[in-house]
């Protein structure tokens, strides 16, 4: 990147930094030196995909009540480009110091932890985070945005304690395009964790296994969900192209195409009902 500094008064110069990303917390002579073994990711929308972690138990015979913290938990093993890491779903929380006049909030956030036994270049972890984000776009059925990424090296708890170095944590910031419209209504989510918890680990693993085969479909699907200001006809055309490509992958050559009679009947039906 580069730096622009300008202004009439030297005491109040305006400085603009131009780069692909910022990494705060470390000193690196070159990008190739940034090797890590842990990433903490916070995505939008996922809080409502998992269950609320707090349960309030009200004692009718007393003024005392019980607040229980029981979040969803999940794990999966990920293999990406012949390297491996482990995914853990972690729910962070804050406890209020006192009771407010009108309400007391118990804030929480579901986060995704990626950890590996070996150190890998941070770009590999960012690729895994990107594929994981696409996976949750598919599960939830709306655009998902990365809210925060933290990285660390020497984090692996399975390392030998005698040779284990002090963990170092870094924050990474990317340029973000904020869309004009974001759908947040959780009632429109395609799936929920409580319906998929027995299949979650296997689903994540298979998603990464088949990601390269579905590259065009997944990229197009993500583009549809993240569109901002696209005309309706252009969006519909993109959906048709995506379904057509996906159809070509799933079905064999014998069943890939329908007859002209079936196609004409479908077009007639579509024109009458749209």
Language model features by range: what are they?
Residues 37-54, 145-169, 263-270:
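Short, charged N-terminal helix-start/capping segments
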Residues 1-143:
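Long, contiguous, compositionally biased segments that the model treats as domain-scale units
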Residues 9, 30, 42, 59, ...:
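Serine/threonine-rich low-complexity intrinsically disordered regions
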Residues 30, 48-51, 81-86, 105, ...:
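Context-gated lysine
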Residues 103-198:
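Internal metal/ion-chelating core segments
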Residues 161-163, 170, 175-274:
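Amphipathic, oligomerization/interface secondary-structure segments
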């Amino acid at each position: 990147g580069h730096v622009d500094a300008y202004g009439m008064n030297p005491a109040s110069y305006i400085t603009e930094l131009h780069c692909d990303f910022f990494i705060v917390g470390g000193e690196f002579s070159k990008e190739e030196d940034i090797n890590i073994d842990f990433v903490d990711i916070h995505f939008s929308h996922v809080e409502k995909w998992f269950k609320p972690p707090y349960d309030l138990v009200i004692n009718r015979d007393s003024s005392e009540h019980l607040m229980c913290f029981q979040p969803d938990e999940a794990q999966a093993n990920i293999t990406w480009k012949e390297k491996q890491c482990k995914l853990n779903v972690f729910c962070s929380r804050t406890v209020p110091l006192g009771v407010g006049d009108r309400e007391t909030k118990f804030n929480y956030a579901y986060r995704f932890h990626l950890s590996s036994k070996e150190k890998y270049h941070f770009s590999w972890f960012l690729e895994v985070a990107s594929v994981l984000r696409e996976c949750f776009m598919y599960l939830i059925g709306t655009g998902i945005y990365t809210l925060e990424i933290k990285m660390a090296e020497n984090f692996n708890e399975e390392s030998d304690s005698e040779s284990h170095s002090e963990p170092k944590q870094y924050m990474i910031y990317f340029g973000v395009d904020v869309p004009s419209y974001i759908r947040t209504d959780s009632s429109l989510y395609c799936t929920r964790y409580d319906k998929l918890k027995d299949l979650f680990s296997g689903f994540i693993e298979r998603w990464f296994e088949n990601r390269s085969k579905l590259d065009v479909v997944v990229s197009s699907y993500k583009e549809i969900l993240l569109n901002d200001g696209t005309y309706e006809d252009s969006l519909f055309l993109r959906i048709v192209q995506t379904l057509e490509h996906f159809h070509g992958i799933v079905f064999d050559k014998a069943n890939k195409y329908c007859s002209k009679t079936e196609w004409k009947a479908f077009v007639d039906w579509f024109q009458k009902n749209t």
